[in-house]
C-alpha cells in the first residue's frame, strides 16, 4: 500500500538510514552499515541515472524534465529502479515538480533528493527503507505535516514535533520522555532547530537502525534500548549525551563514524556482544571516557575511534591490539617494525610514525584507513607468506614520501580513496590481479610513477585517481572498467597515449584536462557522451575519432586542442561535431547559429574572449534544444538575443539586459532559470514571447522591469 501525504515537520530526515535487518539475533551472513555500489552513468530525455552491473539495479540521479506531475518508472533499461538521489537538483525540476509518484520496489530516497523544491504531494511506497539527509527540507510537502510522528515507507521515522511545552525547557524541569512509537523500524530523524530542554529517549525492540545525525541536535539525559537495533549511523548521537554510562544492546552490529563523538560526560561504555564494526572517530573527544567493555568481538575498529579520551591515552603497550586482532596504536621506537602474528587489521597505528620498514603478519586481512599515513620515512612494506589483506583503506599510505615500490598481494580487491596519494618517490606498484576498485585520488600526485598495468578484473576507477602524475606516459584501461571518475588522468603532463575500455559509454569531465602531450586516444564506439573539459588543453591532440552516436558534448570539451582548430579549418567559424556546436571562431558582430545544430554548450573560450565582447546579436535556430550555462560568457555587448522553438530550458546564462533591446523566447520554452537574466530598472529591453505560453506568464511577472511584446 502506498501513502499519499500532504506534508512538513519541525524535524525531518537528515542522513542515510540503514538497510533493514530482520529479526533480533545477529547472523554471520548479515550485511550491515552503508554500502557503495559502483555504477556507470546513463541519460535519457527525462533522467540521469546509474546502472549498477553487480546488483542489476538503477539509481536515478536527477530529473531532466519540466512536468509538474512525475511518475517515476519502475525500470530503466530493463533494470529495476531501487534508489533516487538529487531528484530535483536541477533548477527547472526544483521549480516545476509538484507531484511525484515513486515506484514499488524503491528502497532508498537519497540526501537532498527534493530539498528546496516545489513538491506538494508524494507517494512513497512501503518498500522504502532509507531516507537521506535534507531529503524534503524546504518543500510545501513538509510544511503541511501535522502528525506528532511522521512515519513513511517501511516504518521510516523522518520527523516528530516537540513543542516548548513538552520539551522540559525550564532549567529545573525533569527530562521529557521521548518514546519512539511501535511500528518504527528505521529512525531517520533530525531537527531544523535544536529542541530546548533535555530528553529521556527510549528505543523499542522494533527499531532496526538509527540513521545518521538522528539525535545529534538533542540534549539527552537518559538513553535506553531494547534488543533489536542492528545499526547506529554516523554522528547519530554526536555531542548529544549528558550521561556517564552507556550500555548498548547485544543486537547491535554496526556503529558508524563519529556516532558518539564529543560526549564529554561519558565515562563508561558497555558494547553489545555482537558488535562487529566501530567507525572512524566513533567515540573520539569523549574527554571523560575511562572504561570500554565488550570490545573483544569487534573485527573492525575505525581510525581514531577513541582519540582524545583517557581510555586511549592509558593504552601504553608497544603494540596496542583491541577487539578481534585490531592494531590501533604503536608505541615502540624501532624503525624496522615486525607486526606480531595474530593482528588481523591495522588502522592508524603507524600514522606519522618515524618507521622505515614494516613486515606484515600472515594473519593480516585488512590495511585500514590511515594505517601508515604520512609515515614519511617508510621505504619498504613486506608481506609475510600467507598475508592476504583484501583491502587497502583510505589514506592508508598517503604522504609516505620515501616509499619507492609496493607489491600488493593478489588478495587485495579494493584500494581506497587517497590510499597512495602524495607518495612522491613511488615509481612502481604491482596491482593485484583481482583488484576491482580504485578509489578517489588513489595515486594522486605520485610524481615519480612512470607506468603501471591495470588488471583485467578492474571495474571502477575513482575521480582524480591518477591526477598530477606527471611522469606517467601511457595508460591502457581494461575492458572490464565501466565506472570512470572525473579528472582521473588530469594533469598527467607526460601522458602520450591512452586506450579506453571498449564498453565505456561516456568520457567523464576533465578526464585528460592539461595532458599537454597526449597525442592518441582510442575511443570506443559505445561512447555517447563527452563531458565538460574532457580534453581541454591537450595541446598535442590533433586527431580523435568521436563516434557518430555521441551527440552530447560538454562545455570546452576540446578547447585548446589542435583537433578543435582542425574542425574550424574544415567548417569555418562554427565548429560542429555530431550536431553539437563545440566552438566559434569568427569576427562577425551578428551571429546566426547554423540550422541543424542541436546543442550549444560552448561558443567562446578564454582564447576568443575578445571576439565574444564584440558580438551584438545571436540567433539560435529551432533545432537547438539545449544550451550551456556559459554559452554566452563574455558577450557584454549583446543587444538582441533570439531563442528558437526547440529550447525547453533557459539555464543560468547570466545575461545582463541593461543594454539589451530585444530577447525573443520560443514556443517550446518551459522554464527560465532565476539567474538567466540580470534585470535593472533603467533598461529598454523588450521580451518577445508567444501568447499564452510559459514565457509570457514569466515575462508578465516582471513587467515592471521591461517591455513585453507577444506573437502567435
Which role does the model predict for each range below?
Residues 86-92:
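Short secondary-structure subsegments characteristic of cysteine-rich extracellular domains
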Residues 1-9:
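Bacterial N-terminal signal peptides that target proteins for export
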Residues 10-20:
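Bacterial N-terminal signal peptides
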Residues 18-37:
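Sec-dependent signal peptide cleavage junction
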